[in-house]
């Protein structure tokens, strides 16, 4: 894979306002991006306005052919802690590419001393004290290994929050460094759902994971729009759930609960569960371990029976 690390053109502003860079609780960010000229500026503006700035922000451009790289480079002239890693264009999008590019970015970071590592999508907008408040959650809970705010699509209600408060979407995952090192990095899953794998693995390692519901983030682009129409996406979600080892009972209950919640009503749930059943019948190959499957199914049945709270607890 060919890559080009574009260095900032100016270095005389690197240590401006060093207090905002958090000398004692510093963090770094990595953002995979591909053709996000309509949204990337919102995300960059949100980051540079933070009350606690990252020590380094590495953006990995996956062969962007629009103005994405130009927009990023215009900010790099002033904010030298923003870096750009350019990759050659590829023909087809895939879920695993996001993980591979994020991993490449993490391995390419030049900053060695930091306490937290954040993954950040390129189509988000958030409050100026987002990272300061998020880091505050880690200060309050020494066992918290992975956390993040709630990404709400533009136009959707910010009052209806996810029931599952222990899984953090990949768009906003923020790690205590010890946790990220303990889970041994990110796991690419061809069917998607790598972020769920990350959260579950962190809990298996004894860390707490938390969706921080008082930190709401605007998600500016409809999710998963590059992977086909609505029904094709529902089928793929069923395939994904099988690949992640979901318990069949949990999957049926989940799909039943969505019968009249998601359009097209009824048929969406039927297509979703059909993708799961087809993968089961054809014995689709999984990349996860039996230990992982046992753990995730135990958590799911605990949620169904009310034996597990919405926030995970570490193993003892």
Report the location of each language-model feature:
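A conserved acidic beta->alpha catalytic loop
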Residues: 61-70, 89, 124
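Conserved donor NDP-sugar-binding/catalytic core segment of glycosyltransferases
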Residues: 92, 125-160
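Active-site nucleotide-sugar/metal-binding loop of Leloir-type enzymes
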Residues: 99-116
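Short beta-strand-to-loop acidic/aromatic patch adjacent to the donor-nucleotide binding site
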Residues: 113-125
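Acidic donor-binding loop at a coil-to-helix junction in glycosyltransferase catalytic cores
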Residues: 191-198
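Non-catalytic, C-terminal membrane-associated alpha-helical segments of glycosyltransferases
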Residues: 233-316
């Amino acid at each position: 894979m060919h890559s080009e690390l574009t260095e900032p053109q100016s270095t005389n502003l690197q240590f401006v306002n060093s207090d905002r860079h958090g000398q004692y609780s510093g963090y770094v960010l990595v953002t995979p991006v591909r053709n996000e000229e309509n949204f990337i500026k919102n995300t960059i503006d949100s980051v540079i306005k933070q009350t606690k700035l990252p020590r380094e922000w590495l953006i990995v451009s996956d062969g962007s052919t629009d103005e994405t790289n130009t927009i990023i480079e215009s900010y790099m002239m002033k904010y030298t802690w923003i870096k750009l890693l350019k990759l050659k264009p590829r023909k087809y999008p895939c879920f695993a590419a996001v993980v591979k590019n994020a991993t490449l970015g993490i391995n390419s970071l030049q900053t060695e001393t930091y306490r937290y590592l954040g993954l950040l999508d390129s189509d988000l907008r958030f409050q100026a004290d987002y990272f300061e408040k998020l880091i505050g959650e880690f200060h309050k809970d020494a066992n918290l290994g992975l956390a993040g705010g709630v990404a709400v699509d533009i136009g959707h209600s910010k009052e209806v929050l996810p029931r599952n408060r222990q899984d953090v979407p990949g768009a906003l995952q923020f790690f205590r460094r010890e946790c990220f090192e303990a889970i041994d990095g990110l796991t690419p899953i061809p069917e998607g759902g790598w972020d769920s794998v990350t959260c579950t693995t962190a809990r298996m390692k004894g860390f707490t994971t938390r969706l921080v519901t008082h930190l709401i983030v605007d998600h500016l682009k409809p999710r998963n729009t590059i992977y086909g129409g609505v029904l094709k996406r529902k089928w793929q979600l069923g395939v994904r759930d099988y690949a992640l080892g979901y318990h069949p009972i949990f999957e049926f209950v989940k799909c039943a609960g969505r019968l009249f919640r998601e359009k097209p009503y009824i048929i969406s749930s039927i297509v979703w569960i059909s993708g799961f059943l087809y993968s089961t019948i054809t014995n689709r190959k999984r990349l996860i371990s039996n230990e992982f499957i046992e753990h995730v199914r135990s958590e799911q049945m605990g949620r169904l029976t009310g034996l597990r709270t919405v926030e995970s607890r570490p193993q003892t």
